[in-house]
């Protein structure tokens, strides 16, 4: 409900969205959507949002601490009172004394070997919140985007936007077959085209036609590509072919997909206006995260708030394409409002606990003071192998339990990582510090995946195929108890009647309203 207002706000602050010939904001199709909803700026909407917000911060005089990384939260009793961080450039520590903190740190995709996430996505917010006593929720739901680059190896996993398929791109196997017609789930059959002719009519704007199968939800498309590869029908580098060159003129592609055109030109020496791309599934997004109140975005720790990808519960079991941007805009504003209200209602003085601060500093510098230890890069690679092989797109109890055992064994190595003694410009130290959050993130996902014995949304258990009715009645919560992690099911509250009516309404009933 609040997303349109946030888009208008961005425009007032200087964002320039694509327009229709009538002057309205252009909205495009993405996977899982029945209608073109996504306001966009070519295929670089996220960059435009970042640019706009950065400019706004500068003009408002908001302090920004570049290359400053959070280490841990400081508590006064059970309330947030500060955060200890460090400057990557100098290695110097900094203590932020504050009455409230909003975490907006993204997910933990770097726990997997193949991911669209950049180097920052190491579960920092998840780890800090968990250690402070906050609960995590829905961690089993990790989204694998169906289209990441697969070649060359140095760029494997980098995102290929869903906009390629939204603008007409099709998926082909090594035999030239448009295979997504073979993978339409029964629950989506009534709204998905089952012939190429109908799919083309939909692309041409026929409201009576159903959407192409390439625009099914991301979990469906990712599993389909994986199945084709395992059946021996994959592309040479273990993916599928994404072809828009044969579907759209070169000028259209360069105008609507400029980032993708340059990305493949520079990184893979491929001209997407002339030849297909090779793509494959890549870990992309966490539906799970820190458990928050839906209105204020506050956690169970007073003064700690979270929004965006690091907050859980917004997207259920499966996020629709494009909703992450509207999510962070809408719930970012709610988090700001919640934090302001919390601070205004505080009556007691908040103090930083010196013992907490000293402990955080000691844990960080111990890595530099060792004479020897484990190589943090090799430990990270081992963690990524575990998650890629045991907690992937499809899961079984046996593989998950093996993965959990390996993660448990890896904890000793993480506690004994070593980096060169100088804290200045020390990426090895940065990597070692990140591992403390990555192992928490990886273990939380694995434990939750073991406990959910069904296949729902982005969580697929091939030993428990299909959804179970019971699965709708609970969420899985991750808690810190003493020095160990526990996962437990908690009953969900009854949703508002309005949402119940929507969930059980037919497509025709919804369109008639």
Where are these regions (language model features)?
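Conserved FAD-binding subdomain of flavin-dependent enzymes
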Residues: 1-17, 134-137, 142
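Alpha-helical scaffold segments in soluble metabolic enzymes
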Residues: 5, 9-12, 48, 52-59, ...
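Conserved redox-cofactor binding core of oxidoreductases
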Residues: 6-92, 97, 104, 148-152
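Glycine- and aromatic-enriched mobile tails/lids
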Residues: 9, 15-39, 76, 165, ...
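Fold-independent oxyanion-binding glycine-rich loops
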Residues: 13, 20-21, 41-43, 67-69, ...
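Glycine-rich loop(s) and the adjacent beta-strand/alpha-helix scaffold that form part
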Residues: 100-158, 190, 318-338
């Amino acid at each position: 409900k609040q997303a349109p207002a946030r888009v208008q706000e961005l425009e007032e602050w200087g964002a320039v969205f694509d327009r229709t010939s009538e002057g309205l904001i252009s909205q495009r199709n993405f996977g899982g959507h029945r209608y073109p909803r996504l306001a966009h700026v070519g295929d670089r909407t996220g960059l435009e949002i970042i640019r706009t917000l950065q400019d706004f911060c500068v003009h408002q005089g908001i302090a920004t601490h570049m290359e400053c990384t959070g280490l841990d939260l400081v508590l006064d009793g059970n309330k947030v009172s500060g955060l200890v961080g460090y400057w990557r450039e100098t290695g110097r520590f900094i203590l932020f004394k504050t009455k409230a903190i909003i975490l907006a740190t993204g997910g933990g995709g770097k726990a997997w070997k193949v991911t669209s996430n950049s180097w920052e996505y190491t579960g920092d917010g998840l780890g800090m919140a968990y250690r402070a006593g906050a609960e995590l929720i829905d961690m089993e739901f990790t989204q694998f985007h169906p289209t990441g680059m697969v070649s060359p190896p140095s760029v494997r996993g980098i995102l290929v936007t869903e906009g390629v398929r939204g603008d007409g791109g099709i998926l082909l196997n090594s035999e030239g077959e448009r295979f997504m017609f073979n993978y339409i789930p029964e629950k989506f059959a009534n709204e998905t085209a089952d012939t190429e002719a109908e799919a083309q009519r939909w692309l041409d704007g026929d409201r009576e036609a159903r959407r192409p199968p390439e625009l099914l939800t991301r979990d469906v498309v990712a599993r389909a590509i994986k199945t084709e590869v395992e059946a021996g029908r994959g592309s040479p580098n273990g993916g599928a072919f994404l072809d828009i060159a044969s579907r759209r003129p070169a000028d259209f592609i360069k105008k609507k997909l400029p980032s993708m055109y340059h990305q493949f030109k520079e990184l893979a020496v491929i001209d997407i206006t002339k030849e297909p791309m090779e793509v494959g599934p890549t870990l992309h997004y966490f539906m799970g995260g820190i458990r928050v109140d839906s209105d204020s975005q506050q956690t169970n720790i007073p003064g700690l708030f979270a929004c965006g990808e690091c907050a859980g519960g917004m997207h259920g079991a499966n996020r629709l394409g494009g909703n992450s941007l509207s999510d962070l805009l809408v719930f970012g504003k709610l988090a700001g409002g919640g934090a302001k209200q919390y601070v205004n209602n505080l009556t007691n003085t908040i103090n930083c606990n010196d013992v907490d601060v000293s402990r955080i500093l000691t844990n960080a510098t111990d890595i530099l003071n060792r004479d020897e230890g484990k190589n943090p890069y090799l430990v990270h690679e081992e963690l990524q192998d575990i998650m890629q092989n045991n907690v992937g797109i499809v899961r079984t109890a046996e593989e998950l339990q093996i993965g959990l055992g390996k993660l448990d064994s890896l904890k000793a190595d993480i506690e004994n990582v070593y980096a060169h003694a100088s804290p200045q410009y020390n990426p090895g130290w940065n990597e070692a510090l990140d591992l403390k959050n990555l192992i928490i993130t990886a273990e939380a996902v694995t434990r939750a995946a073991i406990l959910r014995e069904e296949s729902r949304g982005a969580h697929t258990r091939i030993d428990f195929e299909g959804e179970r009715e019971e699965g709708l009645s609970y969420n899985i919560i991750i808690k810190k108890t003493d020095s160990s992690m526990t996962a437990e099911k908690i009953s969900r509250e009854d949703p508002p009647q309005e949402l119940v009516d929507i969930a059980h309404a037919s497509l025709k009933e919804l369109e008639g309203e």
